[in-house]
């Protein structure tokens, strides 16, 4: 089940609130300019699936988002616990960073913890299959796939180069809860 835990930056051990109802999660994130939506991930995709398989299975949804928001680049991150670079990828995504453009993720399998650092608050969004999250350009965030990743997410960008992170150098991500396997 998707959830949202909201923390003040000064108290990473205790959330101010925890939400599990879709409407509550979506409205709380919308107040911060973040889109959280439910889409139907109809095709059966397993972590480890190729980018071509995933894009082919979700072409209609991808085309809709690209047309709706003007995204020009799409890629897929598909990881399972056997991936040889899982530790390196986890470490990279766990560093707080921002992008010069919106970042959109549509989870078509598994789950991941997408954490946003906005002003004095941290919003930890547990995203699962069917969840779509769109983070505005410039929003500081990090992503945890857990020690044993199991997820497939379609990522859309306004940048032709795709995923380009500007790391903040802050260690805040290490102070907040991570995704437990």
Swiss-Prot record:
Ni(2+) binds at residues 97, 99, 103, 141. It is an enzyme of class 1 (oxidoreductase). It comes from the Bacteria. The record marks 96 as: May play a role in metal incorporation in vivo. Its cofactor is Fe(2+); Ni(2+). It catalyses: 1,2-dihydroxy-5-(methylsulfanyl)pent-1-en-3-one + O2 = 3-(methylsulfanyl)propanoate + CO + formate + 2 H(+); 1,2-dihydroxy-5-(methylsulfanyl)pent-1-en-3-one + O2 = 4-methylsulfanyl-2-oxobutanoate + formate + 2 H(+). Binds 1 Fe(2+) cation per monomer. The keyword Oxidoreductase applies. Its EC number is 1.13.11.54, 1.13.11.53. Keywords: Amino-acid biosynthesis, Dioxygenase, Iron, Metal-binding, Methionine biosynthesis, Nickel, Oxidoreductase. Pathway: Amino-acid biosynthesis; L-methionine biosynthesis via salvage pathway; L-methionine from S-methyl-5-thio-alpha-D-ribose 1-phosphate: step 5/6. One of its GO terms (biological process) is L-methionine salvage from S-adenosylmethionine. The keyword Oxidoreductase applies. The record marks 102 as: May play a role in transmitting local conformational changes. Fe(2+) binds at residues 97, 99, 103, 141. The record marks 105 as: Important to generate the dianion. Gene3D superfamilies: Jelly Rolls (2.60.120.10). Monomer. Belongs to the acireductone dioxygenase (ARD) family. PANTHER family: ACIREDUCTONE DIOXYGENASE (PTHR23418:SF0). Catalyzes 2 different reactions between oxygen and the acireductone 1,2-dihydroxy-3-keto-5-methylthiopentene (DHK-MTPene) depending upon the metal bound in the active site. Fe-containing acireductone dioxygenase (Fe-ARD) produces formate and 2-keto-4-methylthiobutyrate (KMTB), the alpha-ketoacid precursor of methionine in the methionine recycle pathway. Ni-containing acireductone dioxygenase (Ni-ARD) produces methylthiopropionate, carbon monoxide and formate, and does not lie on the methionine recycle pathway. This is Acireductone dioxygenase. It comes from Pseudomonas fluorescens (strain Pf0-1).
